[in-house]
């Protein structure tokens, strides 16, 4: 079920999803008697899982500055006690995104985007707080602004990590990885026939 609505620069959405017999991958002891300490990763179905939440998007414009602020709340509850996975948390996970666009004089354009997702305990997993900041400065050239030169910086503070803790059948695993999205560079774009002139 989903519901969306908007008015001028305000948009909102709500959703609810119920999944039955959802497949999941989880860990359990392989054989405590013959092979103690050996963990087996396997798949099984969970009788009932629920995901629901909502989002609010604000996109006003103040002259040369156009921010877009997104605030969302997410819940996820998946009861895996039939698989002997005992934790059953249902904390809310807030997520905030601020995307700033600045249309500057003389063909300059600046975009700065930041995201912050707070940690939460949901179902039988624990998510850690994570966030990133990206920026791009663009200068347009030529009469029709067909040539664009951009200075790009992705994941400026190298914070784009993913930290995930998950419980299984008498097991506990912790994962952390870095997506290696940090980039600093120059981008060139040229749009042919930018004015859509059929004689060009």
Predicted regions: what they are:
Residues 14, 22-33, 79-87, 121-128, ...:
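Outer-membrane beta-barrel translocator domains and adjoining extracellular loop/strand segments
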Residues 73-78, 90-142, 166:
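C-terminal beta-barrel architecture of Gram-negative outer-membrane proteins
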Residues 141-200:
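C-terminal beta-signal and adjacent terminal beta-strands/loops
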Residues 7-11, 64-69, 106-111, 143-149, ...:
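Repeated loop/turn-to-beta-strand initiation elements of outer-membrane beta-barrel proteins
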Residues 7, 16-20, 60-64, 73-79, ...:
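Transmembrane beta-strands of outer-membrane beta-barrel pores
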Residues 2-70, 84, 95:
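Outer membrane beta-barrel strand-and-loop segments of large Gram-negative receptors
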Residues 1-5, 54-60, 73, 96-102, ...:
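Residues on the lipid-exposed face of transmembrane beta-strands in outer-membrane beta-barrel proteins
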Residues 1, 48-52, 88-94, 129-133, ...:
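Residues that define the transmembrane beta-barrel architecture of outer-membrane proteins
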């Amino acid at each position: 079920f989903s519901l969306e609505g908007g008015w001028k620069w305000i948009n909102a959405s709500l959703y609810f999803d119920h999944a039955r017999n959802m497949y999941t991958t989880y860990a359990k002891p392989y054989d405590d008697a013959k092979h103690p300490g050996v963990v087996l990763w396997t798949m099984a179905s969970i009788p009932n899982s629920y995901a629901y939440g909502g989002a609010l998007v604000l996109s006003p414009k103040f002259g040369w500055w156009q921010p877009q602020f997104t605030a969302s709340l997410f819940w996820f509850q998946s009861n895996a006690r039939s698989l002997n996975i005992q934790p059953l948390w249902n904390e809310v996970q807030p997520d905030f995104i601020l995307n700033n666009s600045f249309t500057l004089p003389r063909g300059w354009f600046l975009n700065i985007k930041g995201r912050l997702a707070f940690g939460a305990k949901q179902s039988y997993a624990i998510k850690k707080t994570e966030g990133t900041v990206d920026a791009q400065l663009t200068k347009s050239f030529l009469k029709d602004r067909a040539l664009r030169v951009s200075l790009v910086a992705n994941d400026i503070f190298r914070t784009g990590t993913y930290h995930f803790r998950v419980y299984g059948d008498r097991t506990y695993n912790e994962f952390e990885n870095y997506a290696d999205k940090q980039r600093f560079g120059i981008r060139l774009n040229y749009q042919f026939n930018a004015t859509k002139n059929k004689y060009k």
